[in-house]
């Protein structure tokens, strides 16, 4: 796959609160404070900085300045540093992160490229499945489709998908749906409508998943948006192409 071309989206969302409860990130994420530094904490260890790159899979809480922060989820990338929790981005990486969160698709592409040195190339057939799953969360890509696309028996196909993307097939589908719903809510969509559009069983199902993966409940996130006028930061970029969603 050529440099800069990836099937993975980079989802940008506002964080309109001053604290996130304990939760693990599903994928690698860049947090950028709007006014002052951010602190992430886990098991007595903390990392503070204006822009932080947070390791996925580690349960952590977050303290933010009074204006909150923004986050870009770098889907498909492996955390490239040895730090157990997070690293503060400085210099050009910090500038790229700020530009990316501001809506600069070229900056998002370059940021991904500079952080991709620990990520293996994605097999072309897995990329096809990833594109299909991210394009429309209402389209239930099945294990049978995965098996046919990869031309492997089921167990091997599921292992191949996890090894290639870093997530199980089921978790990748759930995470893709959650990002879609979060983007809708960031543009002031009703929770029940966002849940339906993203394929969740009901509002309660979306609320449980949202809380466990983001560290706050949807109602708190939406209430926080009412106190800020930065909701237009919510975007979903497919790097290497035009933005798929610009929700401004």
Task: Mark where each language-model region is.
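Terminal helix-turn-helix DNA-binding modules in bacterial transcription factors
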Residues: 163-201, 224-248
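Basic/polar phosphate-binding segments, predominantly the helix-turn-helix DNA-binding elements
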Residues: 144-173, 195-220
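Amphipathic alpha-helical segments enriched in hydrophobic/aromatic residues interleaved with Lys/Arg
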Residues: 78-136
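Helix-turn-helix/homeodomain-like alpha-helical modules used for DNA recognition
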Residues: 14-22, 205-224, 235, 239-248
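N-terminal regulatory/effector-sensing and dimerization cores
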Residues: 1-85
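A short, Lys/Arg-enriched amphipathic alpha-helix from helix-turn-helix/homeodomain DNA-binding modules
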Residues: 113-141, 147-150, 171-190
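Short, Lys/Arg-enriched N-terminal segment that forms or immediately precedes the first helix
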Residues: 14-16, 110-118, 158-165
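Alpha-helix C-terminal capping segments
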Residues: 30-34, 38-41, 60-62, 95-102, ...
């Amino acid at each position: 796959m050529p440099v800069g071309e990836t099937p993975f989206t980079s989802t940008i969302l506002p964080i309109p609160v001053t604290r996130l409860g304990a939760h693990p990130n599903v994928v690698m994420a860049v947090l950028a404070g709007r006014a002052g530094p951010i602190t992430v904490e886990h098991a007595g260890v903390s990392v503070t900085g204006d822009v932080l790159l947070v390791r996925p899979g580690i349960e952590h809480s977050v303290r933010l300045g009074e204006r909150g922060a923004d986050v870009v989820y770098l889907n498909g990338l492996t955390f490239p540093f040895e730090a157990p929790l997070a690293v503060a981005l400085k210099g050009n990486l910090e500038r790229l992160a700020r530009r990316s969160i501001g809506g600069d698709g070229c900056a998002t592409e370059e940021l991904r490229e500079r952080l991709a040195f620990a990520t293996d190339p994605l097999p072309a057939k897995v990329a096809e499945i990833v594109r299909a799953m991210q394009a429309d969360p209402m389209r239930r890509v099945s294990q049978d489709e995965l098996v046919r696309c990869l031309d492997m028996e089921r167990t091997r196909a599921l292992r191949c998908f996890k090894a290639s993307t870093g997530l199980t097939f089921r978790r990748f589908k759930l995470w893709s749906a959650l990002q879609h719903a979060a983007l809708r809510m960031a543009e002031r969509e009703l929770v029940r409508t966002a849940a339906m559009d993203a394929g969740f069983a009901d509002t309660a199902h979306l609320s449980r998943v949202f809380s466990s993966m983001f560290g706050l409940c949807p109602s708190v996130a939406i209430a926080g948006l009412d106190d800020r006028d930065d909701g237009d930061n919510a975007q979903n970029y497919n790097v290497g192409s035009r933005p798929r969603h610009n929700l401004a």
